[in-house]
Amino acid sequence: MAVRLCDVASLLRSGSWAAEPWTGQVIAAMETQLSNGPTCNNTANCPNTINCSSPVESNNTEDSKTNLIVNYLPQNMTQEELKSLFGSIGEIESCKLVRDKITEGQSLGYGFVNYIDPKDAEKAINTLNGLRLQTKTIKVSYARPSSASIRDANLYVSGLPKTMTQKELEQLFSQYGRIITSRILVDQVTGVSRGVGFIRFDKRIEAEEAIKGLNGQKPPGATEPITVKFANNPSQKVNHTILSQLYQSPNRRYPGPLAQQAQRFRLDNLLNMAYGGIKSRFSPMAIDGMTSLAGINFPGHAGTGWCIFVYNLAPDADESILWQMFGPFGAVTNVKVIRDFNTNKCKGFGFVTMTNYDEAAMAIASLNGYRLGDRVLQVSFKTSKTHKA
């Protein structure tokens, strides 16, 4: 490891790599690791890494020997920087930073790099796996070809002790199989654990065994049993076509198929994965102690509910994005984007009505401070001080 890190650090100091914005940071990280010794390969004794284990064994297909998955990338790292970093090892055929489609291109913290030469892919794993960038320790391994045995192996875990660390969460679940990724959700303002986490296993059968063994059990430090279940049941995924059709009928009450609990937590996971580091910014329209306003009516809708004010929307924002963001938290009865009379462009704010207070409060807690494109949304219950439609 030390020799390879030295080689890469030397390469980065020379030639075209020296001008890259990330070069200094990578070199510093490599030099720190060289002075501290080899990167830890044992998760139990390595608190700063997440599943920092030996590379995944290679599959038999030729493509799998060149295609790598890179996890735990810094949130602000671009695809160009990812390509430059791995391009320092060898010639790359393709590189892709995975982005959130709903949030207009925000990085999800992982990507894929496909080399021309399998030897370069192997060298990249041996050289860059476990490298610490900013607050992240990146994990580099062979990407697995898609198959039924590895799909839907992501678990949602609730009821965790607020004091449980990510390392302890992995230790609890590691007895059932190889863990690919893990995460504990934290409050965006206080940083305190929300008692909810996610574990992704290498194979679905491992996830099934974890459910059998841990669902309803009390882990160390817990006062209540934890809930363990699949987080991404395909039958609970958002059907955007149906969602759009529902919106086309303004007098039809939204039945809330997106309110299923698993889907709600799945979106919550995505939001926290992508934007957990952003501090929430509260609406300039004062929130009067999470005041509820029952009986709010929008033009064309006579229902009652809890009205939510959404501020700092982009000029091209439309109602469908509000459906997509708020639907997973519960039953939505109406959405409205306020538009300029002359241009028909969004004036920067809109309203969402939800039938259940707890679901509305959860949506506010999760989406206030949420970055949509280049804008940070401000979400609160509608008050008398809020803009009027």
UniProtKB/Swiss-Prot annotation:
GO terms for cellular component: cell cortex; cytoplasm; protein-containing complex; ribonucleoprotein complex. It comes from Xenopus laevis. One of its GO terms (molecular function) is identical protein binding. Residues 66-145, 153-233, 306-384 form the RRM domain. GO terms for biological process: intracellular mRNA localization; negative regulation of DNA-templated transcription; negative regulation of transcription by RNA polymerase II; nervous system development. SUPFAM superfamilies: RNA-binding domain, RBD. InterPro entries: ELAD_HU_SF, HuB_RRM2, HuB_RRM3, Hud_Sxl_RNA, Nucleotide-bd_a/b_plait_sf, RBD_domain_sf, RRM_dom. Belongs to the RRM elav family. Expressed in brain, testis and ovary. Ovarian expression is restricted to follicle cells surrounding the oocyte. From the early tailbud stage, expression is neural-specific and is seen in both the central and peripheral nervous system in differentiating neurons but not proliferating precursors. Expressed in the retina from stage 32 with expression becoming restricted to the ganglion cell layer by later stages. Keywords: Cytoplasm, Developmental protein, Repeat, Ribonucleoprotein, RNA-binding. This is ELAV-like protein 2. Binds to poly-U elements and AU-rich elements (AREs) in the 3'-UTR of target mRNAs. Required for the vegetal localization of vg1 mRNA. Probably required for nervous system development. NCBIfam families: ELAV_HUD_SF. It is found in: Cytoplasm; Cytoplasm, Cell cortex. SMART domains: RRM. Part of a ribonucleoprotein (RNP) complex, at least composed of elavl1/elrA and/or elavl2/elrB, igf2bp3/vg1RBP, ddx6/Xp54, ybx2/frgy2, lsm14b/rap55b and, in a subset of RNP complexes, stau1/staufen. Binds RNA as a homooligomer.
